[in-house]
Amino acid sequence: MDQTLQQHGPVDLAFTAPPSKSFTHRALIIAALADGESLIRGPLIAEDTLLTVRALQALGADITDTPEGYRVQGTDGRPDCAEGTVLDLKNSGTSLRLLSSIALLCSSTAGVTLTGSPRMQQRPIGELGDAIRTLGGSVRYLAADGYPPCVVQGPLVGGEATLDGSVSSQFISSLLLAAPYAVRPVDLKVARQPVSRSYLEITGAVMAAFGVPVRRVGYTHFTVQPARYRGREYTVEGDYSSASYFFALAATLGGKVTVRNLNHDSVQGDRLFVAALKAMGCRVTRETDGVTIERTKNLHGISIDMTTAPDTVQTLAVVAALADSPTTITGVGHLQYKESDRVAVTAGTLRALGCTVDISADAITIHPGPLHGGVIDPHDDHRTAMAFAVLGLAVGDVTIEDPACVGKSFPKFWNALAAGGLL
C-alpha cells in the first residue's frame, strides 16, 4: 500500500535515533571473526543487518538474538562453511562488499559465492576483486566481469595492494576487516582521496575496540599487522543518517525537533548534515545525549561538499528545495552506484514536484520554486523514500510508492512519523 503525506505546519517533537547501520555491520563481522564470545548491545535490526547476520551464520558464526543484543561466538578467524555456500545479500551493498574479503578466510575448497538483487549485479566490485587477487585470493565473476555474482576463494596471503578509492570506501573497509588474519601484514595504498572516507574511520574505530589497530597515513595508506580480534561487549551508537530525516522536519516544516541517542564525538560523516542546516539558517543546540534543530526564519541556499556524508545528500536536497536561493551540493558523483542512481533519481523527482535542478559529473544544484504534490517512485531505495516523505509533509499531496523499502535501514520510520502526529 502506498503512503500519502499531507501538509503539516511547524512541529515541536522529540525522537530517538535508531542504532547505526554502519557500526552494526562492522561489529557483527568483527565479532564473528573474534576469539571468544561477544555481546553486541543495541544493534540495528533491519533488512541489511539481518542479511549480514544470516551470512555470518552461514560462514560458521554462532549468533543468537537475545534481549540484551546479539550474542556472537566467534570463529577465531577461521570461518567454516559448507562446500558450495551461496550468500545472497539481496540489495545490501554493504553486506556484499564487506563480506567479500571475509570469504577469503573460509575453509571451503570451492570458494564462497556472493550474489544479490538485479540492482546489486549492476554495482561494480572490480576494484575490490583486483585487490583480493593481489593479496593472494581468487575471484571469479559468474556474469559480467567486475560485477556480482562472483566466487571468492582464499587464501588471504597479505602484502601490498593499491585501490583507486573513487567508487566506494567499502572496498578498503572490506580488506581491512579481514586483514588481521592474513599470513603477512596487509598494506593498502589508495591512489586518490577515498569517497565516504568517514566510513573508514568507523571501520578503524570498531577494529580498535576489538583489539586490532589500523595504522594509517591520512586516508591514502593503511597497514594492518597479523593479529586476532578479542570478543567483548560492544554498544552500537545512534545513527546520524537516520536522524537526518527528523532534523529535516524542523528545517522544512518550521519549529523544532530534538533527536536523542546521538554521540557528539562520533566519527560518522553524516554529522555534517547538522552543520549544513546551521549554515542554511537553523539554530543548533547540543543536548546531553542529542541535538535540537530549530527553524524560525527562512532557509538560505548554500554550497557544500558532501563527499564525507553521502547518505544525507538526498535529505539536504529536499531541504534545499524550500530555501530562498539555490543550493549546490558537490561530492556526489559516486552516488550513482548506490541502491539507485541517487543523483539522477533525486534530480528527476525534484523536477517532477516543481524544482529546477542542474546536475553535472560531481554536483547537483537545486533552484527552489513553487512545489506541488505528486507520486514518487523511490526505485527500491530506502533513503529516497524517507527524504521525499519529509518534503511531502511540507508540500502536501505527495504519495510514496513502495513505502516498505525503508525496512532496509529504518523499519520503524513510518511508525515514528505516526507517533509524532505527522501521518
Swiss-Prot record:
Ranges annotated as spanning the membrane: none
Pathway: Metabolic intermediate biosynthesis; chorismate biosynthesis
Similarity remark: Belongs to the EPSP synthase family.
Gene Ontology molecular function: 3-phosphoshikimate 1-carboxyvinyltransferase activity
Residue numbers annotated as active site: 311 (proton acceptor)
Catalytic activity as recorded in UniProt: 3-phosphoshikimate + phosphoenolpyruvate = 5-O-(1-carboxyvinyl)-3-phosphoshikimate + phosphate
Protein name per its UniProtKB record: 3-phosphoshikimate 1-carboxyvinyltransferase
PANTHER family assigned: AROM/DEHYDROQUINATE SYNTHASE, PENTAFUNCTIONAL AROM POLYPEPTIDE
GO BP terms in the entry: amino acid biosynthetic process; aromatic amino acid family biosynthetic process; chorismate biosynthetic process
Purpose: Catalyzes the transfer of the enolpyruvyl moiety of phosphoenolpyruvate (PEP) to the 5-hydroxyl of shikimate-3-phosphate (S3P) to produce enolpyruvyl shikimate-3-phosphate and inorganic phosphate.
Keywords: Amino-acid biosynthesis, Aromatic amino acid biosynthesis, Cytoplasm, Transferase
Assembly and interaction partners: Monomer.
Cell compartments where the protein resides: Cytoplasm
InterPro entries, per the entry: Enolpyruvate_Tfrase_dom, Enolpyruvate_Tfrase_sf, EPSP_synthase, EPSP_synthase_CS, RNA3'P_cycl/enolpyr_Trfase_a/b
Binding site for 3-phosphoshikimate: 21-22, 26, 168-170, 196, 311, 338
A Pfam family that the UniProt record links to this protein: EPSP_synthase
Binding site for phosphoenolpyruvate: 21, 93, 123, 170, 342, 383, 408
HAMAP family for the chain: EPSP_synth
Top-level taxonomic group: Archaea
Enzyme Commission number, as recorded: 2.5.1.19
The keyword Transferase is assigned to this record: yes
Annotated Gene Ontology cellular component terms: cytoplasm
Taxonomic lineage of the native organism: Archaea, Methanobacteriati, Methanobacteriota, Stenosarchaea group, Methanomicrobia
